[in-house]
From Swiss-Prot:
Domain UVR stretches: 202-237
PANTHER family (alphabetical): UVRABC SYSTEM PROTEIN C (PTHR30562:SF1), UVRC/OXIDOREDUCTASE (PTHR30562)
Listed name of the protein: UvrABC system protein C
Xref: NCBIfam families: PRK00558.1-5, uvrC
Chief subcellular location: cytoplasm
Organism: Gemmatimonas aurantiaca (strain DSM 14586 / JCM 11422 / NBRC 100505 / T-27)
Subcellular location field: Cytoplasm
Self-association and partners: Interacts with UvrB in an incision complex.
Biological-process GO terms, alphabetical: nucleotide-excision repair; SOS response
Gene3D superfamilies: 5' to 3' exonuclease, C-terminal subdomain, GIY-YIG endonuclease, UVR domain, UvrC, RNAse H endonuclease domain
Length: 616
């Protein structure tokens, strides 16, 4: 039935409506005090509505409505359906995943404490949800350290083991499973766990202190010592708590911040006048929505499902669904303070919300930058186990099989780090064998870093194909360093090979990751060929000088040290060469003549040119 035909038959009752597109996908879930009036308003006020609403109405092809007893029921159902369908036009909690809870099975004779992501109506106590999983883990660690809660899954008292487990031996449990701890004593301890998770640390400390004194009076000094240690740990935890002086003690304080389509709602949980925790939610699809609608949607979708709510909820401003939400919160009163200590708390919560929203925007900006960062792209495209923040690239260079050398250039965060460049002469064998050369160089490079206890690079890049890659892999395996990432880059097709993968990877020509690899490969080639040319030049100079009679290795080194090259020697004067130890004027003249330099004969007479006649 077309939507227009459904409108006249809608009831003027509280309920929830679902707009759907041509494929039956839910576009939007809304609630209404009077369904017919609310749904009709989408067409009656279409020209006055926001661009977002007009875009949704153009896609609407069907309507589903659900009648409920009251506005409070409508609010609850709306939040449930939004979480189920994730409609694209609703204000939604960003990353609305199932956050974990701490579950205490108080419905069992011997309750357990565990983590769960499912909130069930099973009689257990749930604490959370925890957006900060680290905070939840810290709370659980305190519970395990102070309270001897059983960790087994036996359905006590009916199902039980024959003997206590290891937890009993290390005093983490008192073995109620085999009757070493009574049900009454265990339940008293669970009450303290619940108080602790509920933020009533002072009550827990008072109870532990009473039990410690009672144990001392009964001369049970071992038990008294255990309780004393637990009390000391609780006091240490309690000392840094922030005290917020407001009468009444327990309340949740809401802060709100908005930046365009993004919004943040922060809740400070205050118990016994002390700030126990801070939680928050980020919202998306908030464009074209009033702040009141955004705040109400967040509290309905998130805060309403929280287990450990306070009796008072302070919000920064009023919103349309406040009364309906309050009715659904079962004993929590919503207040909008205008001045005084309560308003100061709300202002503090607002400040927290602004800070969290700024952090989120910065994190999003960094994520966008990482998307084009060659280091992150390389890890993503190649599936590398470690982010290649540091990489070393190897290249082999030779001149027609002679003067074989190698280079290792180092890149950090995509940029060359020249202080870490290294060059090598191939020593193990003579001749031209790229595979053996690569094996030798990789072995020498990583062995030296291991010996010097220098950090190893995250990735090694080989200039070459599968053969060079295999040689490098063998070298790393022999050194016991298989955890280092290893790839090779073939020049012709710019194919990237990975050991163990039969097919190469080809990145787009404009890929920042490929350009970074090309830069490293080209830099390694430049560094290697420069060293190879220097080595060849030195060999040429050596052979040329050693052919001259009277010039041995010592004189050759002295000449090269002084003049740098054969050409430098040719351009020197007899006096300059004669000044070098081991040379005299005669040997200097013979050296220059041997190098083909015409040296004037100092013993021949000189002919003076006639002088000009005097001026008359």
């Amino acid at each position: 039935m077309p939507v227009a035909q459904k409108l006249p038959h809608l009831p003027e009752s509280p309920g929830v409506y679902l707009w759907k597109d041509v494929e039956g996908q839910v576009l939007y879930v809304g609630k209404a005090k009077r369904l017919r009036s609310r749904v009709r308003s989408y067409w009656a006020q279409e020209h006055e509505s926001s661009p977002k609403t007009r875009a949704m109405v153009r896609k609407v092809r069907d309507l589903e409505t659900i009648v409920v007893p009251s506005e409070a029921h409508a609010l609850i159902l709306e939040a449930t359906l939004i979480k189920e369908y994730h409609p694209r036009f609703n204000i939604a909690l960003r990353d609305d995943k199932s956050y974990p809870y701490i579950r205490v099975t108080v419905n069992e004779p011997f309750p357990r404490v565990m983590v769960t992501r499912r909130l069930l109506d099973d009689g257990a106590r749930y604490f959370g949800p925890y957006t900060d999983v680290g905070a939840m883990r810290r709370a659980l660690n305190v519970v395990k350290r102070i309270f001897t809660v059983r960790s087994c899954h036996y359905a006590l008292p009916g199902e039980a083991p024959e003997r206590p487990c290891l937890d009993y031996s290390i005093k983490r449990c008192k073995a109620p499973c085999v009757g070493y701890q009574s049900r009454e004593d265990y339940r008293a301890m669970i009450d303290e766990v619940v108080w602790f998770l509920d933020g009533r640390t002072s009550d827990v400390m008072h109870h532990v202190r009473e039990r410690m004194l009672d144990a001392s009076e009964r001369l049970d000094f071992e038990r008294a010592a255990e309780l004393r240690d637990a009390l000391a740990h609780l006091e240490k935890m309690e000392s840094p708590s922030v005290v917020l002086e407001v009468e009444g003690g327990d309340r949740d304080v809401v802060g709100y911040a908005r930046d365009g389509e993004d919004a943040c709602v922060a809740v400070m949980r205050i118990r016994g006048g002390k700030l126990l925790a801070r939680d928050h939610r980020l919202l998306e699809h908030a464009e074209d929505e009033e702040d009141g609608a955004v705040l109400g949607a967040c509290l309905a979708q998130w805060y309403r499902t929280a287990e450990a709510r306070a009796g008072e909820l302070l919000v920064p401003f009023d919103f349309e669904d406040r009364e309906s939400l309050e009715a659904s919160l079962d004993g929590t009163h919503i207040r909008v303070p205008q001045r005084g200590p309560r308003r100061a708390l709300v202002d503090l919560a607002d400040q927290n919300a602004r800070h969290l929203l700024e952090e989120f925007k910065l994190a999003a900006l960094e994520a966008d930058e990482r998307a084009v960062d060659p280091v992150y792209e390389l890890q993503r495209e190649l599936g590398l186990p470690r982010l290649p923040r540091s990489l070393v690239c190897f290249d082999i260079s030779h001149a027609q099989g002679t003067d074989v050398v190698a280079s290792a250039v180092f890149f950090e965060n995509g940029r060359p780090k020249r202080s870490e460049y290294r060059k090598f002469k191939i020593k193990v064998f003579e001749g031209n064998d790229d595979f053996r050369s690569m094996h030798e160089v990789v072995t020498r490079y990583f062995r030296r870093r291991l010996d010097e206890e220098k950090p190893l690079p995250d990735l090694a890049v080989i200039d070459g194909g599968k053969g060079q890659l295999g040689a490098a892999r063998a070298a790393l395996d022999e050194l016991g360093a298989p955890q280092i990432g290893l790839i090779s880059l073939a020049k012709r097709e710019e194919e990237i090979f990975q050991y163990g993968r039969p097919d190469p990877v080809r990145l787009p020509r404009r890929s920042p990751a490929l350009r970074m690899l090309q830069q490293a490969r080209d830099e390694a080639h430049r560094f290697a060929i420069t060293f190879q040319r220097q080595k060849r030049a030195a060999r040429t100079i050596t052979s040329e000088l050693l052919k001259i009679p009277g010039v041995g290795p010592t004189k050759r080194r002295a000449l090269l040290h002084t003049f740098g090259s054969v050409q430098g020697v040719r351009e020197a004067s007899v006096e300059q060469i004669a000044a070098i130890p081991g040379f005299g004027a005669a040997s200097a003249r013979r050296l220059l003549e041997a190098l083909g330099v015409a040296v004037p004969d100092v013993s021949a007479p000189t002919i003076d040119s006639p002088s000009d006649p005097p001026l008359s």
